[in-house]
Swiss-Prot record:
Gene: rpl5
Protein name per Swiss-Prot or TrEMBL: Large ribosomal subunit protein uL5c
Statement: the UniProt record of this protein carries the keyword RNA-binding: yes
An individual GO BP term: translation
Subunit structure: Part of the 50S ribosomal subunit; contacts the 5S rRNA.
Gene source species: Rhodomonas salina
């Protein structure tokens, strides 16, 4: 796909979805509002190096500086006190969001071992999609020699779709490789 994902959405996906779901107004067509990338780091409270390397990796992957999330209250069972770092998150919107989604669909997901497509059952029922990745090595920006530990991440794709069918149709039209199960 030589054209950007945003122009592809406007020129091809919007007319397709308007015809499929019989929308009367162009503003009824679902669109992606944001992509949130999140990584929980339980060891971040003890290991500051893990936190720094994760911040650096997520900044490379997303192209945007992540925010360090902190514990809201103390939990003795997890040995965490109020205000300790427990993870990192980055929210992508607009140009960065479409650039990341294009790289995810066309470069990163096909690099997963034994990849047969992603599950349709990861929708939340309101058109939002939540994807969990086991390792950061599927992104071509990450060099194997520079990582200290393999860590996963959660990717949440938030859409304006009202139903699960609309969300599936939107992401499928954008090229998301769903499996048939």
């Amino acid at each position: 796909m030589s054209q950007s994902l945003k122009t592809y959405y406007k020129e091809k996906v919007v007319p397709l979805l308007m015809e499929t779901f019989e929308y009367k107004n162009i503003h009824e067509v679902p669109k992606i509002t944001k992509i949130t990338i999140n990584r929980g780091l339980g060891e971040a409270s003890k290991n500051n190096k893990a936190l720094e390397s994760s911040v650096q990796e997520l900044a490379i992957i997303s192209g945007q500086q992540p925010v360090i999330t902190k514990a809201k209250k103390s939990v003795a069972g997890f040995k965490i006190r109020d205000g300790m770092p427990v993870g990192i998150a980055v929210t992508l919107r607009s140009k960065m969001m479409y650039a990341f989604l294009e790289r995810l669909i066309h470069l990163s997901l096909p690099r997963i071992r034994d990849f047969k497509g992603i599950s349709v059952q990861l929708f939340d029922g309101r058109g939002n999609y939540n994807l969990g990745l086991k390792e950061q090595l599927i992104f071509p920006e990450i060099e194997y020699d520079r990582i200290d530990q393999i860590r996963g991440m959660d990717i949440a794709i938030t859409t304006t779709a009202k139903t699960q069918q609309e969300g599936i149709a939107l992401l499928k039209a954008l090229g998301m490789p769903f499996n048939d199960n």
